């Protein structure tokens, strides 16, 4: 994109990670072929280059993995918490040691900038394993009664936007509490989960405690519906989450759902404009807006609308879109052709409905899946771009006059995952935050995460909490 500064390329070396030409399923501590021999290709979204060929799990493979996890559960759950903690600490340290390798791998398979995988994702991944390792021998003091018991086998399905981080969010508390795991990564981003399987072997984790099944929706459905799975945890789209909720209804499975969002970022007239602009950019353009808690709705007080939008457009014009492995890149590739098509369709619908589109001027690479940072003005609550989760680098701008109007507009959504408040008045932050129906509310910042803090939503954003002490409950019989 156009910028006041020219940056020489500063690419991270791809050679730091060795991607095998093919990968199997990870079942009972071994990499094995799918029972029916099916495979699929995983592609770099920045170049459309085939990275590797991966075994595709089917129903028979799910059954094998669940049986392996059930066998492992008997010994794993009987281990003292201090012994389970040793494995988690070991995994965390190996992740730190291999963080550069994992960051490059995640960027290649997902498309997000290397700065984000290196500086945000990987430190948080290790932190989650360190954090829950600390809880493993303290479960009696977590507030869930004496001797809380693990549930059994956890079936976990994770999305493509934060593959390794979502894996850590789910596997770390499950193992700390004595459960065993069968995890299905997204079909577009299976590689980091398979590398994690190798880390489990490197850490000496007992066979069957963690099983990784790359595959498509049929494998996920088989896992969720397996009669010997005691716990289901899903992060992904609201539509799939609803289907999962229906499928486990009437069973004794425990369920956690973290689904879509349409987060409101509220900027009051006393907010420092430059600081707010940086928060807005972080809120919606981090990971190309492919974040469930993205601040995709900007609610700005009318009196500062023009000033803030001018500043925001100037800032967007300095963002650099391109090679995700370049350390200077701000905006990487969209994860898949299907997701790019969805973003394009919703943006075109926004224009057709009368919202005014502004996109940063930039040259999109000829190969790969790309979308320029975009914002819509003259948006009403009725516009599709104000209601639907686009899951891309697209910001919808609405205005308000009073705090009550801001709260009403922010809450006028089927989702309730996240929100942000920008103001210099602490009393206003507390008053507004208390009225927002959102699982997490950031004050004068956005998209900040910590393993000690619970995360989850209301309404169609799901239920249950991941992270913090609260994240233990999802994997305990309490």
Range-by-range predicted roles:
Residues 49-139:
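Glycine-rich loop-to-alpha-helix module at the N-terminal edge of alpha/beta enzyme cores
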Residues 47-53, 205, 229, 266, ...:
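Conserved C-terminal structural/oligomerization subdomain of aldehyde/semialdehyde dehydrogenase
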Residues 73, 77, 92-99, 103, ...:
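Structural signal for hydrophobic packing residues in well-ordered secondary-structure cores
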Residues 1-53, 86, 90, 127, ...:
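Terminal low-complexity tails and localization/encapsulation signals of metabolic enzymes
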Residues 239-380, 409, 443:
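ALDH superfamily catalytic-core signature
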Residues 48, 80, 84, 106, ...:
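Residue-level signal for inorganic ion chemistry
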Residues 138-275, 400:
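Rossmann-like NAD(P) dinucleotide-binding subdomain of oxidoreductase/dehydrogenase enzymes
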Residues 50-57, 72-78, 156, 265-268, ...:
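Short, well-ordered beta-strand elements within core beta-sheets of diverse protein domains
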């Amino acid at each position: 994109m156009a910028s006041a500064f020219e940056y020489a390329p500063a690419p991270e070396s791809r050679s730091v990670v060795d991607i095998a030409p093919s990968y199997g399923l990870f079942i009972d501590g071994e990499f094995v072929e799918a029972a029916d021999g099916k495979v699929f290709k995983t592609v770099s979204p920045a170049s459309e280059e085939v990275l590797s060929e991966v075994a595709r799990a089917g129903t028979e493979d799910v059954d094998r993995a669940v049986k392996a996890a059930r066998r492992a559960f008997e010994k794993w759950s009987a281990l003292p918490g201090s012994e389970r903690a040793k494995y988690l600490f070991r995994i965390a340290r190996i992740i730190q040691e291999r963080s550069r390798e994992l960051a490059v791998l995640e960027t290649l398979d997902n498309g997000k900038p290397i700065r984000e995988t290196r500086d945000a994702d990987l430190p948080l991944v290790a932190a989650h394993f360190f954090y829950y390792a600390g809880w493993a021998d303290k479960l009696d003091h977590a507030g869930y009664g004496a001797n809380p018991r693990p549930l059994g086998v956890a079936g976990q399905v994770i999305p493509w936007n934060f593959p390794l981080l979502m894996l850590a969010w789910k596997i770390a508390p499950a193992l700390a509490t004595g459960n065993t795991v069968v995890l299905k990564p997204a079909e577009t981003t299976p590689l980091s989960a398979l590398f994690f399987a190798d880390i489990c072997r490197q850490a000496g984790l007992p066979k069957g405690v963690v099983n990784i099944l790359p595959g498509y929706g049929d494998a996920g459905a088989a896992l969720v519906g397996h009669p010997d799975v005691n716990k289901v945890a899903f992060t992904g789209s609201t539509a799939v989450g609803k289907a999962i909720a229906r499928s486990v209804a009437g069973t004794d499975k425990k369920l956690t759902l973290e689904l879509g969002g349409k987060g409101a970022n509220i900027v009051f007239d006393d907010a420092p404009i430059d600081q707010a602009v940086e928060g807005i950019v972080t809120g919606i353009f981090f990971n190309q807006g492919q974040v469930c808690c993205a601040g995709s709705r900007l609610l700005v007080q009318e009196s500062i609308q023009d000033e803030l939008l001018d500043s925001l457009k100037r800032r967007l014009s300095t963002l650099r879109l391109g090679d995700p492995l370049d350390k200077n890149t701000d905006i990487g590739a969209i994860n898949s052709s299907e997701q790019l098509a969805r973003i394009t369709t919703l943006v075109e619908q926004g224009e057709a409905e009368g919202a005014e589109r502004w996109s940063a001027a930039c040259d999109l690479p000829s190969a790969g899946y790309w979308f320029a940072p975009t914002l819509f003005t003259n948006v009403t609550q009725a516009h599709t771009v104000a209601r639907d989760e686009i899951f891309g680098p697209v910001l919808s701008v609405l205005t308000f006059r009073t705090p009550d109007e801001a709260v009403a507009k922010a809450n006028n959504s089927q989702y309730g995952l996240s929100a942000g408040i920008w103001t210099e008045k602490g009393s206003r932050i507390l008053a507004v935050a208390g009225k927002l129906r959102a699982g997490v509310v950031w004050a004068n910042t956005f998209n900040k995460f910590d393993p000690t803090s619970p995360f989850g939503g209301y309404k169609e954003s799901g239920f249950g909490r991941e992270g913090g002490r609260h994240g233990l409950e999802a994997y305990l019989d309490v």
